[in-house]
A protein has these predicted regions:
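Detector for C-terminal structural segments
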Residues: 13, 237-241, 246, 336-367, ...
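N-terminal lobe/hinge region of extracytoplasmic solute-binding protein
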Residues: 69-123, 154, 226-227
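Aromatic- and charge-enriched surface segment that lines or borders ligand/interaction sites
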Residues: 117-162, 176, 182-184, 276-278, ...
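Ligand-site clamp/hinge motif
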Residues: 219, 249-295, 424
Length: 560
């Protein structure tokens, strides 16, 4: 029986028209306005086992863990400190949010309840009341209630680290009663409900009891975790594997098919990752190299399924304290890059070139934007205009190959293209995310060019645009490692957040994309397809384009 996957097709990849303006949903299970539509009928067919088969299969599967090979381990288990996708692979075993993206049987994505049963929104879209579940406890026995939510949100905002970028300016978080919490915003924030799928709830008791020198438990929570989720952190051997075991008191219970343990196995070498999956030593593999997909699809017991994504591959350029501070030089580099060699050669044509900073599939995409294409003569003319007719300077290209198998070859293409402009480029690969992030946040010593994989975790363009390009998110708070700061661009982003109508917001985002294309803070190199690679014994895994690749572990079970 094939893995139970829901193949999500994104309408905007095929239609130029954008979604009709619709206000943010104010009740559970309302369909998302993402450009996501019903999967083809054949992709939805699944073979349902009989009850007897389920019991037998579940008992057999309980004898071994679900093994998921990942290219990188979490930076930290503290979701208020770092919530990039690799961190969330571990964090979402243990932690949950108030709201979640759900996938319906017909393949549509919507906002649904998790720790909040329902919510109410004021007419001015500034006040939200979340009604919480009454049957939830953290795994250390601490009650999950309104006080716990208040503490979590206030901690998240007080830390002022990158995950706080997901939440708008909050005027107050108030406890209405034990199981109702009121959040008052300083101004309307169009994607607020979608953004509430991101803050994960930590046990206040665990964090407070391990606080050191006012760090709100950060140090302890780096390697420890106490949440309301289906699993508890059992062990973590850095650089090797993270193991989580069932939370026996999990509020959804353990009837039906589930796994007792989950192992995140760190495998950075692409060939090794493929061999482990082929041998049946792993059940799911993340980020398999495209070179291996054709062979894997023919391997016995292996399933390869496409999941169209909003994932973009960007090469961002430092806009301060280097020759790249001149936008004409950045434009020249954007024209010099060989997009076709990268997309068709390295990515095996399993990607397309974006028009700009917003991916295909987003309702905010400016379909009239003209992308940069390779034009070496134009690139050389811009270099001469900027005062660098022969190049004559040196840059560092910073990569993290463990995050993307394609990065070494992508860097070599860019290095060669820069050489054509007389720019000497040195490639510097970082071994882990913490080191990588530390360097791009250093204004003086950071690399001139770095690779960044952007992923839409919610159905709203502000999520990535703000943290990558807004002036407020340079340095420690964000990932604006290009140090791009433009008052007009900031103003457009800020204004778009306060408008409920998508049609009105889109006009602002169209203007914004024109500015970014002209300023060229990044080379928008490719929008990749995504492929789910698993063993055919894996059941219950549902593909979701938001929070790309992070499973709902509770739903997973194994048929052997």
């Amino acid at each position: 029986m094939r893995t139970k996957l829901v193949l999500l097709m994104i309408v905007a990849l095929f239609l130029a028209a954008c979604s009709a303006p619709t206000p943010e949903p104010a009740a559970p299970q309302e369909e998302s306005k993402a450009a996501v539509t019903e999967a083809p009928a054949e992709a939805q067919k699944t073979e349902e086992p009989t009850e007897a088969e389920k019991v037998a299969e579940s008992a057999e599967a309980a004898s071994r863990p679900f093994v998921f090979t990942v290219r990188q381990e979490p930076v930290t288990m503290d979701p208020h400190v770092n919530d990039l996708s690799y961190s969330q692979y571990g964090q979402r075993l243990v932690y949950e949010a108030l709201i979640e993206y759900t996938v319906s049987p017909d393949g549509k994505v919507g906002l649904g309840p998790r720790l909040a049963e329902s919510w109410d929104v004021s007419d001015d879209a500034k006040t939200y009341v979340f009604n919480l579940r009454k049957d939830v406890k953290f795994s250390d026995g601490t009650p999950f209630n309104a006080e716990a939510v208040k503490w979590n949100l206030e901690r998240l905002l007080a830390l002022k680290l990158p995950p706080s970028a997901r939440i708008p300016p909050v005027d107050s978080v108030d406890v209405v009663d034990d199981y109702s919490v009121k959040i008052v915003l300083k101004s309307p924030f169009a994607p607020f409900l979608a953004s509430m799928t991101l803050p994960l709830m930590i046990s206040p008791t665990a964090a407070q009891s391990h606080e050191e020198e006012g760090d709100m438990g950060q140090k302890w929570l780096t390697d420890n975790a106490v949440g309301t989720g289906p699993y508890m952190l059992e062990s973590w051997v850095r650089g090797q594997e993270l193991t989580a075991t069932r939370n026996p008191d999990y509020w959804r219970g353990w009837e039906g098919n589930h796994v007792d343990k989950v192992v995140l196995q760190v495998v950075q070498e692409p060939t090794t990752q493929r061999l482990i999956l082929e041998a049946g030593e792993a059940d799911l593999a993340d980020n398999i190299a495209f070179d291996d997909l054709d062979a894997l699809s023919q391997a016995p017991g292996v399933v390869v399924e496409p999941g169209i994504s909003l994932e973009m591959l960007n090469m961002c350029m430092k806009t301060v304290e280097s020759p790249l501070a001149d936008k004409r030089v950045r434009q020249a580099v954007s024209y010099a890059f060989d997009y076709d060699s990268f997309i068709n050669g390295v990515l095996n044509s399993r990607a397309q070139q974006p028009l700009g900073p917003v991916p295909f599939g987003s309702w905010a995409l400016d379909q009239d934007l003209q992308p940069y294409t390779r034009d070496l003569e134009k690139a050389k003319a811009l270099m001469a205009e900027a005062g660098y007719p022969d190049g004559g300077f040196k840059v560092t290209i910073q990569t993290i190959a463990a995050y993307g198998w394609y990065q070494p070859r992508e860097a070599q293409i860019l290095q060669q293209n820069l050489g054509e402009l007389g720019i000497e480029a040195v490639i510097d690969d970082k071994a882990d995310a913490a080191t990588f992030l530390g360097t791009i946040r250093d204004k003086e010593k950071g690399p001139e060019i770095y690779f960044w994989r952007s992923v839409a975790a919610i159905d709203d363009p502000d999520y990535e645009l703000r943290r990558m390009y807004h002036s407020d998110f340079v340095g420690e708070r964000g990932v604006n490692g290009s140090w791009f700061q433009d008052p007009k661009a900031d103003e457009l982003l800020d204004k778009a957040l306060t408008i409920p109508s998508r049609e009105e917001r889109k006009s602002l985002y169209d203007e914004y994309q024109v500015i970014l294309k002209d300023e060229a803070p990044c080379i928008w190199a490719a929008q990749m397809n995504y492929y789910i690679t698993s063993r055919d014994v894996l059941k219950g895994y549902v593909w979701n384009p938001f929070n790309i690749g992070v499973p709902d572990y509770y739903q997973i079970w194994l048929s052997e």
